């Protein structure tokens, strides 16, 4: 039985989304146990009679405070020690939960998770990784915003972590790793990227060299590594592009009676296209490099999206991702010391 602690008060919608998503997750996975962390009186009102259906597979753990989306990470860490976010992560630290899922403030989540859980040996900084849609299925990208400025060593560590995550959760023996750059040629890029490429060439990962921004969506590689500034810009740009495309398609097909009829004929194709680029099915970013599993849901996630983040958490628990990353880092650094 896998136990996941949910920050029930975090995000733009709080328990209005988290509670229904939790119930959906329990329905779909009979081997799942969930802990809703937050204001007990509020949560019980949302649950009412539904909690009885799941017995001890669903329980409420009271937390008196909430980390707001505008809270500064340092203040949330220092001043809100009984927040739903902090308590959910504490449950992971104490062994009462196998993972935590939160739609709350990203900066606060990273700060609290790093403080409470600590990083794995050999990891300087945790990184945020998520899957984005591509022509071949999806591509994992990291870092997506945790680290704005990165050294070559950080990029190297990100690549090793991402490689091991994809090997574990997707059961690919040798996923390909690309380093995001302004061109594929070795002479291009800043010094950090060039040095990171040198490190990765001997890192015992399937490093294929530099890739460009369009390779993320072409699916040229399984994992794209970059710093958090570029990664976050790329992610937000892709989300905006998907919305723009959907907007224009909807507008063009509703511009006249003829285009409306054409839209009805094309509806199955349009629905398939919409599903393919729907960001909700990719919701759930992992905070890699910690001694525990923490999944960040989009702050504006709906119930389907949040349930997907729970599914990602379950998979990482089943595959023991932190343990595997820890073992990989130990092997990598042992090999580097011998070289």
Curated annotation (Swiss-Prot):
Protein name: Phosphate acyltransferase
Gene: plsX
Pathway(s) the chain acts in: Lipid metabolism; phospholipid metabolism
Keywords: Cytoplasm, Lipid biosynthesis, Lipid metabolism, Phospholipid biosynthesis, Phospholipid metabolism, Transferase
SUPFAM superfamilies: Isocitrate/Isopropylmalate dehydrogenase-like (SSF53659)
GO molecular function: phosphate:acyl-[acyl carrier protein] acyltransferase activity
Intracellular or extracellular location(s): Cytoplasm
GO cellular component, one term: cytoplasm
EC annotation from Swiss-Prot or TrEMBL: 2.3.1.274
Organism this protein belongs to: Methylococcus capsulatus (strain ATCC 33009 / NCIMB 11132 / Bath)
Any GO BP: fatty acid biosynthetic process
Quaternary structure note: Homodimer. Probably interacts with PlsY.
Reaction catalyzed: a fatty acyl-[ACP] + phosphate = an acyl phosphate + holo-[ACP]
PANTHER family named among the record's database cross-references: FATTY ACID/PHOSPHOLIPID SYNTHESIS PROTEIN PLSX, PHOSPHATE ACYLTRANSFERASE
Keyword Cytoplasm: yes
